[in-house]
Amino acid sequence: MEIAVEREEENYLELRIQGEDHTLGNLIAGRLRSVKGVILATYYLPHPLKDELVIKIKTDGTISPREALNRAIEDVKVLGESFLDELEQV
C-alpha cells in the first residue's frame, strides 16, 4: 500500500491509495461519515482495472480531515477487535 496526498486544505483532504480497492474505501469512508464534524466522506476508483482508490474528506472546521481520518481508523480497529472477540465465543 502506498498513500499519496493529492490535495490538502484546512478542511479538505484527498488521498490516493495504491494497492487497495472498494473493500478499504467503503470501510474507511463509512466510518468517516460517523465522525462528528465530517460533512463529506467518499471514495472512488479512478480506473476499474487498477488497484487504486481516492478518498475525499471534507470537514466543518471543528476537526481537521487528518484527525477525522485517524478517528475513523481507530473506530475500524475497535470494530475488528470486537468482531474477533465475538468470533472466539462462537
Curated annotation (Swiss-Prot):
One GO term of the biological process aspect: DNA-templated transcription
Location(s) in or outside the cell: Cytoplasm
Alphabetical list of Pfam families matching this protein: RNA_pol_L_2 (PF13656)
Example GO molecular function: DNA-directed RNA polymerase activity
EC number: 2.7.7.6
Principal EC category: transferase
CDD domains: RNAP_L (cd06927)
Main location: cytoplasm
UniProt keyword list: Cytoplasm, DNA-directed RNA polymerase, Nucleotidyltransferase, Transcription, Transferase
GO cellular component: cytoplasm; DNA-directed RNA polymerase complex
Reaction it catalyzes: RNA(n) + a ribonucleoside 5'-triphosphate = RNA(n+1) + diphosphate
Alphabetical list of InterPro entries matching this protein: RBP11-like, RBP11-like_dimer, RNA_pol_Rpb11_13-16kDa_CS, Rpo11-like
Quaternary structure (record): Part of the RNA polymerase complex.
Role this protein plays: DNA-dependent RNA polymerase (RNAP) catalyzes the transcription of DNA into RNA using the four ribonucleoside triphosphates as substrates.
Similarity annotation: Belongs to the archaeal Rpo11/eukaryotic RPB11/RPC19 RNA polymerase subunit family.
Record-given protein name: DNA-directed RNA polymerase subunit Rpo11
